[in-house]
């Protein structure tokens, strides 16, 4: 039944919606071809528009940038971004993630020799917290910095949990850009 698509937490969250709006959510999950996503890169209030419904990411900027990176990769890039398990994949994922963070902060994307400066600009723009900058700058065993497997997995898990809080699980599964 359609009721089975919602857990109690989701029903409680959607209690402010009319029943007809709730049914629209269920039907949307059953018609993936009708799902559209639009990313709004407002640094003060980023959100993802799922058809006409906003999903607020104001307090989840890292998750927003991660989501944008993965969705963009899935939809337009020839080599979709995957879990960064090698030095080259870490560099690819870091570059793509930094690109989304730069778009969100509305700053020029520059790093490489100036990776520390770039990350500090993101911190100054209230996109990154100090602990996140330190995490991205921590050298791994292979000498690389940036997005490592642990950081990637944490972002993926946090994003999925957040989407499940905001949407029926079937719809969250549908719009999650990588398998959980």
Regions found by a protein language model. Give the residues of each.
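Short amphipathic alpha-helical recognition elements used for nucleic-acid or partner binding
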Residues: 55-140, 159
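Extended aliphatic helical segments
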Residues: 10, 23, 35, 48, ...
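Intrinsically disordered, low-complexity acidic/Q/S/K-rich activation/interaction tracts characteristic
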Residues: 1-2
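Short, charged/polar micro-motifs that form catalytic or ligand-binding hotspots
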Residues: 52-60, 142-153
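Short boundary/linker motifs that mark transitions into or out of structured domains
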Residues: 5-81, 85
């Amino acid at each position: 039944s359609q009721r089975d698509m919602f857990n109690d937490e989701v029903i409680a969250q959607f209690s402010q919606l009319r029943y007809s709006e709730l049914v629209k959510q269920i039907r949307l999950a059953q018609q993936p071809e009708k799902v559209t996503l639009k990313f709004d890169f407002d640094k003060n209030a980023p959100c993802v528009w799922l058809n006409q419904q906003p999903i607020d990411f104001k307090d989840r900027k890292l998750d927003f940038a991660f989501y944008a990176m993965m969705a963009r990769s899935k939809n337009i890039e020839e080599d979709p971004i995957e879990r960064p398990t090698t030095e080259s994949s870490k560099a690819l994922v870091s570059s793509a993630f930094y690109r989304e963070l730069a778009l969100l902060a509305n700053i020029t994307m520059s790093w490489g020799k100036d990776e520390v400066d770039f990350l500090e600009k993101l911190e100054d723009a209230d996109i990154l917290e100090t602990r996140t900058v330190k995490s991205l700058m921590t050298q791994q065993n292979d000498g690389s910095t940036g997005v490592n497997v642990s950081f990637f997995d944490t972002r993926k898990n946090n994003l999925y949990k957040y989407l499940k809080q905001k949407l029926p699980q079937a719809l969250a599964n549908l719009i999650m850009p990588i398998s959980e």
